[in-house]
């Protein structure tokens, strides 16, 4: 009896020890580590961080460390990512020197970096944003009508640009991408007005962007476009060439006589 009782107790102790060991192992496996993995940040927050780094390197000298603006440049709070696309993708920013109007230059940033800058500026106070997707799928005929109504008085009917007052000018539109055209309509840079969705909705802006891309990349089957300035230079060339031809013919006839 005593031996049987000892065997039962020993067996019970063994089961208890085995159970405690298993429980300890499970607890250790499930317990949180002192170096728990930090949840991955969203792509948005990473873009904001990278955009701020780009801003501090290339923009803060003029616009301030906190985008508050200063003597060298205006505040960027609330301007939106559309302004970034227009200014940076066209090469106007960073500004190389103070002038009446920022000229178009070679672009210093990649499209990815421009988008990161835009995300950062957008995070500061919102503002106009360029919609994603195809920006040149609008109605071409309607885009031409809207362009002639709202844009041609400054940019010329063919987007060749023109002079304005006080040393400013409406730039030629040929090098501009659809994003730059759309960003200009949303942000209203320099002397250009800002077109809200109440004035030109998203379809209207897409139509204008398509028309600009079409007219600035169209071929000239009639020969030299003469800057697309219209009938004035065309008439002048015809007059000079025609009169020159008449003078030559007259001299030739006189010489033969």
Per-region residue spans from a language model:
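N-terminal Sec-pathway targeting helices
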Residues: 5-16, 187
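Ser/Thr/Pro/Gly-rich low-complexity linker/stalk segments immediately outside membranes or between
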Residues: 33-46
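C-terminal capping alpha-helices of c-type cytochrome domains
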Residues: 12-33, 106-131, 196-256
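Periplasmic/extracellular electron-transfer cofactor-ligation site
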Residues: 44-48, 52-78, 90-99, 123-132, ...
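Extracytoplasmic electron-transfer domains, predominantly the class I c-type cytochrome c fold
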Residues: 77-124, 164-220
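Short, Lys/Arg-rich N-terminal segment immediately upstream of the first membrane anchor
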Residues: 1-10, 173, 226-230
